[in-house]
A protein has these predicted regions:
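Alpha-helix boundary/N-cap detector
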Residues: 120-123, 127, 156-163, 181-185, ...
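A short, terminal or domain-edge coil/loop segment
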Residues: 17, 86-97, 118, 144-160
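Charged, amphipathic alpha-helical linkers/stalks
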Residues: 131-170
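Cross-kingdom TIR/SEFIR domain
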Residues: 22-141
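Conserved N-terminal substructure of TIR/SEFIR domains
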Residues: 1-59, 82-83, 90, 171-250
Length: 250
C-alpha cells in the first residue's frame, strides 16, 4: 500500500479550514486523497470514496466539526475509518474544528483517546500539519536501514565514499539546538549533494524532496522555524539518503 492520506470533512468547512490544511500538506508533496482532485461528476461515489479512497489509504485526517457531525456522507466515511483504525490498518489524525473535545457526542469520543488538535479559524493550521508530516516521515523511515543521524555516523563516519556528507553531518550536530536556520542550511546542502550525485528523484515519492525546498525557502526569507520543522528536515534528509544509496522501498 502506498503512503496516502484520506481527507474526511464536511464540504461546508472546505474554505474555512480544509483547503488551508491541504495547502500545507501538498507543499510537502504528501499524497492526499481529496474529493475535488479524485472524483468527477457521474462517478460511483461508494466505489471512489470508500474503495479507492478510505480502503486504499493508510492515514486519515478527520476534520470534525458541527458540520461534519451533521453530514451523512462524512459519517459514512468516519464509520469506515473507525473500522480500519480498530483493525490497525489506518492511523488517524483528529482535528476538532470550532468544537471542543468535551463537546463531542458519544459516537466520536474514541478520537479523544488519540492525540488531537483543536483549531479555530484564528489558529494557524501549519502546526497541525507539521505533526502529520512528522508522523508520516517517521513511519516512512522504518522501511530503511538508516533511521537516525546517529545511526548514519556510526556506520559511515570513517567511510571515505561519504566523507563530504559526514563532514556536513558532524557540523550539523555541533550547532546549537536553538539555531534552526543554520541546521537547515547544512541539511539543505547535504540534500542538494545527494540529488546531484545520485540523480535519484525520478524514482522516489515527491514528498521525499519537495518539503526540502519549501523549508529552505522559509529560512531564506527569515521566517520562524521551530524544532518540529528541523526534525522534519532531518528525516527528509535521511529518506533521501536511504533511497539514493539503498534504493526506494515501497
Amino acid at each position: 500500500m502506498n503512503t496516502m492520506l484520506f481527507f474526511c470533512f464536511s464540504s461546508k468547512d472546505r474554505h474555512s479550514i480544509v483547503e488551508s490544511i491541504l495547502f500545507h500538506l501538498t507543499n510537502y508533496g504528501l499524497p492526499v486523497w481529496y474529493d475535488r482532485h479524485k472524483m468527477l461528476l457521474g462517478d460511483e461515489r461508494d466505489n471512489k470514496n470508500f474503495d479507492e479512497g478510505v480502503k486504499a489509504c493508510n492515514y486519515s485526517i478527520i476534520i470534525l466539526s458541527a458540520n461534519t457531525i451533521a453530514s451523512e456522507c462524512a459519517n459514512e466515511e468516519i464509520d469506515l475509518i473507525y473500522q480500519r483504525y480498530k483493525q490497525h490498518k489506518m492511523y488517524v489524525f483528529p482535528i476538532f474544528f470550532n468544537i471542543k473535545a468535551s463537546q463531542l457526542p458519544e459516537k466520536y469520543c474514541w478520537m479523544k483517546r488519540l492525540v488531537y488538535k483543536e483549531l479555530t479559524v484564528a489558529n494557524d493550521s501549519r502546526s497541525a500539519c507539521n505533526h502529520i508530516i512528522c508522523k508520516v516521515t517517521l513511519d516512512e523511515l522504518q522501511k530503511y536501514k538508516i533511521k537516525t543521524i546517529n545511526e548514519y555516523l556510526k556506520l559511515y563516519k570513517n567511510n571515505k565514499a561519504f566523507s563530504y556528507l559526514t563532514e556536513l553531518i558532524d557540523s550539523y550536530c555541533k550547532i546549537s539546538d536553538e539555531n534552526h536556520n543554520a541546521q537547515i542550511a547544512l541539511l539543505y546542502a547535504g540534500c542538494l549533494y545527494i540529488k546531484e550525485k545520485y540523480n535519484c528523484c525520478l524514482e522516489i515519492p515527491e514528498f521525499y524532496y519537495k518539503g526540502i525546498k519549501r523549508l529552505f525557502e522559509e529560512t531564506r526569507l527569515n521566517l520562524p522555524i521551530d524544532l518540529r520543522e528541523t526534525l522534519i528536515f532531518e528525516r527528509l534528509f535521511l529518506l533521501l539518503f536511504n533511497a539514493a544509496i539503498f534504493g526506494y522501498t515501497i
